[in-house]
Structure formats: C-alpha cells, structure tokens
Regions:
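Conserved active-site-proximal phosphate/metal-binding subdomains
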Residues: 1-110
C-alpha cells in the first residue's frame, strides 16, 4: 500500500531515470535510493557496485512497502494518478467517456 500511496502523492516532476550510464535505464520515483544511485553513477561507480546497491530494492518497495530505499518503478504518468481505482472502474469510465464523446460528435455533425 505504501508503494501505491507514493504513486498517488507523486507530482509530474517526482520521477527520475537511473541506469542510463550502465545502459539499463529505469524510470523511478525520486527517493533516497534514487538519489544515492544517481550520485554513485555520476561518481563513476562500477556496474557491480551499482548492481549490489540496488539488489532487492524492487522487492523492498513492492512487498515490504519501503518507499525510501526501495526502487519505486513508475512512469512520468505518476503525476496524473490521483486516486486508487479498480481496473473495472477504469474500463467502465473509459467506455462511458467514449459513449458521451461519440454522442457529442454525432450531434455536432448532424
């Protein structure tokens, strides 16, 4: 739940990319782990040191709810997520919006 809450609280500027130098870019939420990783990258850390540093970080975020030292993978779209919704609600909302827009377009063109 901590991971979900972090996504919901995120603003559009709260993500960063790690792993560019190593050739394995990953967009994640900014946190202590991300800042330290980027610092290590800029200082020229070896690939193995970076791997060792991040080992288990995704597990810590997802299963243990560690939002500080866990890797909170997230796209830039995180800033647009404002609530937790079920997939069913999202799909139903999309279909409702589609039907409303289709009706509006048909009225304009008739």
């Amino acid at each position: 739940q901590n991971y979900k809450n972090a996504i919901i609280k995120a603003k559009d500027t709260d993500t960063t990319v790690t792993g560019r130098i190593a050739g394995t870019p990953v967009r994640i939420l900014k946190n202590k782990m991300a800042r330290t990783y980027i610092k290590k990258e800029k200082e020229g850390a070896e690939m193995m040191e970076l791997e060792k540093y991040t080992l288990g970080s995704l597990k810590r975020a997802v299963f243990e709810g560690d939002v500080e030292t866990g890797s909170l993978m997230s796209g830039q779209v995180a800033g647009m997520v404002h609530e937790e919704r079920s997939l069913k609600d999202i799909i139903e909302g999309l279909f409702k919006e589609y039907e409303e827009e289709k009706k509006r377009v048909m009225e304009v063109h008739l």
